[in-house]
């Protein structure tokens, strides 16, 4: 447990806060593995190049990530020299569904979700 007065603890916590423009999409209906294919293609690229890659990528996750990237760009102040510093997908909850099969059997279908985060930074 941290020592000190409550206001001092809050001041220290706010001083360490990350001020880079970012955006997070929670409970995206795409698996982490499929989202990472698209995220690996844009990691480290500048914003305009990444938007071009996402525009012509046929995967479903690219449309979600494109909207998320545009949101992160709007959170930033200077949009000319932004690049993607971090982008990652974390595992979310899994919806369990039942698919009827032959001879009275039932298979379980797992519909996976993910939490996708994009953090931008300015080139120096």
Locate the predicted segments by residue:
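Ribosome large-subunit tunnel/peptidyl-transferase-proximal elements
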Residues: 2-89, 115-123
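Generic structural "secondary-structure junction" signal
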Residues: 27, 32, 97-100, 109-111
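Short acidic (Asp/Glu) patches
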Residues: 38, 100-103
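Short, flexible micro-motifs
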Residues: 47, 95, 107
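A short, conserved strand-capping beta-turn/loop at the end of a beta strand
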Residues: 89-101
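C-terminal edge-of-domain segments
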Residues: 102-124
């Amino acid at each position: 447990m941290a020592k000190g007065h409550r206001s001092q603890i809050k001041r220290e916590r706010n001083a360490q806060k990350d001020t880079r423009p970012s955006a997070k999409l929670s409970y995206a209906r795409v698996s982490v593995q499929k989202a990472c294919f698209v995220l690996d293609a844009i990691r480290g690229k500048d914003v305009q190049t990444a938007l071009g890659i996402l525009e012509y990528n046929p995967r479903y996750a690219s449309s979600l990530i494109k909207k998320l990237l545009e949101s992160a760009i709007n959170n930033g102040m200077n949009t000319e020299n932004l690049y993607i510093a971090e982008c990652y997908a974390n595992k979310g909850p899994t919806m369990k569904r039942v698919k009827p099969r032959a001879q009275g059997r039932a298979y379980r279908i797992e519909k996976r979700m993910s939490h996708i985060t994009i953090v931008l930074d300015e080139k120096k």
